[in-house]
């Protein structure tokens, strides 16, 4: 076996282990009593500006659309700060979790609907001040349609709060050079460089007005996820260290947190 094949086998084993560790960590957060639902440990950190960067862009009188809301984690945090939230997702299971969790809101200002996001959005045009679209775009085939639909749903002067993965980190480039699938999730249809993201947004009527740092990309992510499922205190310190590294090395950010204005 050549050195290249050995290197590829080792790197492939790391990717496989990271994917399995992430799934296990999500289950352990519930099994260890940290959450009533199966959630990633990152969603159990405190509600600080860095953990939930988008909340500072949600105005008290805003009407918010959460596209790809999943289990409603972000929808419900926004609902505690704004006038009204609508969440849409294609998973009936996740929407069930969101509906159950919404019972804890101080007022019933969140609604959830099922939708095939590959086919558009079942909402009126010009209705929303803000659209949240977090960790979704990379899972969608028909991204131009979805972005056009998001643009249609916004009021004049509205904004989209977007997060997508960065494909240009050192770790991902190393995987790609070895001929391996380098995306951070097996279901991702695309990951972006900043230039690619800007071009896709511009094509669909958006521009980036501000970028927030995320966390430093690392091949140790699976181990870090498992730590989070067992000790949130240690996970918090590791996450803070990854944020410091991301600020120091912007090209190594695991993703892009972007505030996008409709043109």
Task: For the regions a language model picked out, list residue spans one by one.
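Conserved N-terminal segment of class I S-adenosyl-L-methionine
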Residues: 1-124, 130-134, 147, 213-214, ...
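A short His-aromatic
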Residues: 135-139
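Conserved Class I S-adenosyl-L-methionine
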Residues: 240-259
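A short glycine-rich, Lys/Arg-flanked "PGG" loop and its adjoining helix->strand segment in the class I
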Residues: 144-156
